[in-house]
């Protein structure tokens, strides 16, 4: 959203050698109108590409929305826009382990509405379950992590101190409880 759009920061991220991708939520923004979502997607992609190179995209889970942002690809093809990858379609999770801090925790799949992959059950059986960053670093130090891992992180959730940290903790805790209710209601 607008709070995460800062031209100078976006350019600086690329200047540091990082890839900049588009974290889209157009089905949600356009109330499920797939054609409007496509137009909105292209508009924002073009706007971002005026600043930096963009070759990858990833949907925003939008847990409170009744619309799944990935559904835009049921009709349209992101590759036609020069996009080379969308993780939920282009990563083989049989070969790549997935860790996300969704819900401000590394085992956020328990409360995630849309940020899920089918292989999660297999990883749980293999003992690849991590609650804290310390759990992950311990597994790394003990050579217990797979060779290929995709991380999805939300840096604002890991603030260093005081009020911002507590505010994020409180907000994410409330959000996780709401998502649990949504998951139970949708079963």
Model-derived features: positions:
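Terminal accessory/targeting
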Residues: 4, 15, 27, 34-187
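Alpha-helical scaffolding within the catalytic cores
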Residues: 2-12
């Amino acid at each position: 959203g607008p709070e995460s759009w800062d031209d100078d920061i976006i350019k600086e991220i690329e200047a540091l050698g990082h890839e900049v991708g588009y974290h889209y939520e157009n089905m949600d923004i356009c109330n499920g109108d797939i054609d409007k979502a496509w137009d909105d997607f292209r508009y924002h992609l073009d706007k971002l590409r005026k600043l930096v190179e963009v070759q990858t995209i990833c949907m925003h889970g939008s847990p409170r929305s009744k619309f799944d942002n990935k559904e835009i690809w049921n009709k349209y093809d992101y590759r036609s826009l020069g996009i080379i990858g969308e993780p939920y379609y282009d990563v083989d999770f049989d070969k790549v382990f997935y860790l996300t801090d969704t819900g401000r925790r590394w085992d956020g799949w328990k409360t995630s509405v849309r940020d899920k992959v089918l292989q999660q059950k297999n990883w749980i059986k293999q003992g690849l379950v991590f609650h804290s960053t310390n759990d992950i670093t311990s597994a790394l130090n003990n050579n217990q992590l797979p060779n290929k891992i995709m991380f999805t992180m939300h840096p604002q959730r890991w603030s260093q101190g005081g009020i911002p940290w507590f505010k994020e903790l409180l907000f994410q805790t409330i959000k996780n409880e709401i998502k649990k209710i949504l998951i139970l209601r949708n079963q």
